[in-house]
Design a protein with these regions (language model features):
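Short, Lys/Arg-enriched charge-dense amphipathic segments
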Residues: 58-65, 99-109, 134-136, 167-181
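A general structural motif
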Residues: 3, 32, 73, 108-110, ...
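Feature activates predominantly on carbohydrate-active enzymes
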Residues: 1-99, 105-109
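Catalytic-core regions of glycoside hydrolase
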Residues: 9-10, 118-211
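Short, conserved phosphate-binding/catalytic loop or strand-edge motifs used
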Residues: 109, 115-117
């Protein structure tokens, strides 16, 4: 597997900074190469404050996590979860770019967008792909030292994914920049990796799923 690591993307009490630092050493020891930071209860990752900069203390913690990842040869990926209240307009696009630039200044060089577990206009896959493609052009490629984007789609499990050509996964496959990786959890939220589920999703997103 190209990506071997951990996604901190759960609900409830997030890990403490000390636990995260210890786990990064663990990842390095056991040859993991990716730590994706996206705890749902981090208000500056998700609603209501994803548009705002991290306070000084929290920003310092992010820097320490990045340095720990470098020491352990682990890619630090910072995720944002804007979908519950994002507006598909220029103002919120610039809010997102501004937040990415703030995180870039902290040392982040790999980014992810989560559109999971949301409702309302944020679930629109056409708007999601337009946003991701524009970010790839305006931010990732213009920086020159930022890794490809990763996205968690609203339909991240076969359990509720729309399998038709009008479904979000098929729209991703037809319109999403091929450099962007797409999360997939399998037949259910926590499931085994099987050839059948990979064939099912890969044929729709037209790329190998990020599992």
């Amino acid at each position: 597997l190209k990506n071997r690591g951990v996604v901190e993307g759960f609900y409830g009490t997030p890990w403490s900074h000390e636990v995260r630092m210890s786990l990064i050493d663990f990842y390095g020891k056991f040859k993991m190469n990716s730590y994706l930071y996206g705890p749902k209860n981090d208000p500056y990752h998700s609603c209501p404050n994803w548009r705002l900069p991290y306070p000084e203390k929290e920003a310092g913690n992010i820097k320490e996590l990045i340095e720990a990842c470098k020491r352990n040869r682990v890619d630090f990926v910072w995720a944002i979860h804007p979908g519950q209240d994002i507006k598909w307009n220029e103002e919120d696009y610039q809010n997102l770019v501004n937040k990415f630039n703030l995180m870039y200044d902290l040392g982040v060089r790999a980014f992810a967008l989560f559109f999971d577990d949301i409702s309302g206009e944020g679930t629109n896959p056409v708007k999601q792909t337009e946003l991701l493609n524009r970010l790839t052009k305006d931010f990732v490629k213009s920086k020159g030292d930022v890794a490809y984007l990763t996205v968690c789609p609203t339909d991240y499990s076969k359990l509720w994914a729309n399998p038709t050509p009008q479904g979000s996964l098929a729209i991703y496959g037809e319109t999403l920049d091929p450099s962007i990786e797409v999360f997939w959890t399998g037949d259910v939220v926590c499931s085994d990796l099987t050839p059948e589920t990979l064939d099912w999703v890969n044929s729709r997103i037209k790329r190998p799923a990020y599992f």
